[in-house]
Amino acid sequence: MSVLPTPLANQLLIALPALSDPTFSRSVALICQHDENGAMGVLVNRPSEYTLGEVLSQMGIDTDDEPLREQVVLSGGPVHPERGFVIHDDAREWDSSLEVGQGVFLTTSRDILEAMAAGNGPRNALVALGCAGWGAGQLEFELGENSWLTAPSDANVLFATALEDRWQTAAGRIGVDLFRLTDYSGHA
């Protein structure tokens, strides 16, 4: 009989300094789904080269909201980089939405972007292109190899902290100063 780990959905996955993969180095991911088949998350501190205005324009969605148009779209991870993922705090029913945790949702349907463009979207929202994925047991292995820390998800980290500060702020929530850690680890 195998024992499944505690699901990590609605946890922040924080890269430790030893994680050298450039895609994930100093990254913070919101884990959106986690079960025996693997895990899926969205990086929440990696800016892409796109603004939301550019993405909306490519989708044929118009908006006059200049701050919305200037919002940076995140690079959510290397999986499905052409797909949009919206992390938000709006419990309304969207065409394709998942409750990640209490008050945090992931939506992948066009209707949320149309609502945002019309000024009727979520109060807080992050838009990302792409996501991160881990196969069965892969995330658990990486946690055992000291590649990541986990911390409870926090709306302040997701929606109110500057992108460049999210890595240290997320770790600080559990009392860890990442700048004081070495970039190697050992096992007893």
Swiss-Prot record:
It comes from the Bacteria. SUPFAM superfamilies: VC0467-like. One of its GO terms (cellular component) is cytosol. InterPro entries: AlgH-like. Coiled coil: none annotated. Belongs to the UPF0301 (AlgH) family. HAMAP family: UPF0301. This is UPF0301 protein XCV3063. It comes from Xanthomonas euvesicatoria pv. vesicatoria (strain 85-10) (Xanthomonas campestris pv. vesicatoria). The lineage of its organism: Bacteria, Pseudomonadati, Pseudomonadota, Gammaproteobacteria, Lysobacterales.
